[in-house]
Amino acid sequence: MTRTTLTATKTVDGTLGYGDTFTVTAKSQGTITWLPAEGSTITRGHAVYSVDADRRPLLYGTMPLYRELRDGVEGKDVELLERNLDKLGYDGFDVDDTFTWATREAVEDWQEDLGLDVTGTVQPGDVVVADGRIRVAELRKPLGDTASGPVLDATGTTREVTVDLDVADEHLVRKGMKATVELPDGATVNGKVKSVGKVATETTSGNDTTTTVEVKVSVGGLKQPYDAAPVDVTIVSEQRENVLAVPVGALLALAEGGYGVQVVEGAATRYAAVEVGMFADGKVEVEGVPEGATVAVPK
């Protein structure tokens, strides 16, 4: 008997993709005159689409613009605009929640650089706000269509795996757990549990009903150009380090109850009762037999 590390794993089906999809909606009059290619990535300050040849740039933030931003306006939306202008290299103003004359001058410089009408004000439909870089998943409008309603569907730019995990297995996973993701070509990449959903969803297929929670797994080192793919996700649900373990086949049911092992001592053998712990990898954690002892495994 020697000390070892036992690792229990659970393998489940997952789907590799770019996470949740959201819709970019136009809020202005005019005609769609430019659209990005599906699959392209758009970063801060670059156009998401164009209306009447005027670009609608991307700003980073979590609050959509809902009113005209102009001199004297105060609020979190002003701070969002100023922070983006600062990141884009415009200066001369304080990044705070107040739209001042200095903010107006920065907006005018920005509008001039974009080739827009220089007004010094920003309307809600003039920009697109997202929490970071976006990837164009699907175009919802053709060129020449009216600039109102859904224009395109987008996602984030980081690939992740979504798993619909049976609620019976929910106790096996928690945020931060390590995972291994096997791709369709057999290659594997490392992952980590990013989130475990709090809402259970019931799905019926024929006579079978399953209840699942959504688990997100972040992945790194992906070289394969999959936009979406079915994958196998192996999650390390439990790990015990530096424990004494024997092959499961070495366990014997004792007449008095419980389990034991057959200890080999030279030409003699004896039975020793043991307390069992974790089972994994065809082995079982045991206590009650000293390290270095030899145990018999029945054939």
Regions found by a protein language model. Name each.
Residues 21, 53, 196-202, 253-256, ...:
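Short, conserved beta-turn/loop elements at beta-strand boundaries and strand-helix junctions
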Residues 37-90:
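Long, charged alpha-helical "stalk" segments
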Residues 69-117:
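A short amphipathic alpha-helical interaction element
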Residues 165-187, 219-232, 290-293:
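Surface-exposed connector loops and short turns at secondary-structure junctions
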Residues 222-299:
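Edge-of-domain interaction segments
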